[in-house]
């Protein structure tokens, strides 16, 4: 039994490393473009609006915390808001309109031209993330999608698409976290160097 569990640990780590390696070998331009769009938006007084479901909601909150607080360097606070945290808004919009509108409605209320919307979806199929990216684009926000699998409708809804090509939700989430840390690092460096 212990050997089976040890094998599981080793196999899981090997899968995670293999996917990180695959993404490392891919084109870095979408990640660089995402960071540049965020730097440009924040540099012009805009804000970053982040959203996703489940683990992706947690990632949205994590990035907002890193930018409002600090990632690795002391610098001025950066305007980042996770649209996943206000349970009263989420439940009222979900109940009165539809769950597919919980993020789009907040984009309509909070988003302004020059802001940046970052939608996260491991499946690439989340209707509420697609709806929010559509609302953001209509309002003149830059749009970024961070997806898994083939990117799906979420990837197609965004101007900038960062994809982690895997069917494993857990492995996609792990690489998403790494890529989001890279984006935080790039954004933070841009503001520290100013």
Residues of each region from the PLM?
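Short, glycine/polar-rich helix-capping loops at beta-to-alpha or helix-loop-helix junctions
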Residues: 146-158
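Glycine-rich, small/polar surface segments that engage phosphate groups of diverse ligands
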Residues: 37-111
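A short, well-structured juxtamembrane/interface segment
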Residues: 24-44
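A charged, well-structured terminal subsegment
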Residues: 109, 116-117, 170-194
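Generic N-terminal amphipathic, Lys/Arg-enriched alpha-helix
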Residues: 1-26
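Short, well-ordered beta-strand core segments
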Residues: 117, 143, 160-163
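Short beta->alpha connector loops at strand-helix junctions that form conserved
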Residues: 84, 121, 147, 162-170
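Short glycine/serine/threonine-rich phosphate/pyrophosphate-binding segments
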Residues: 56-61, 125-132, 154
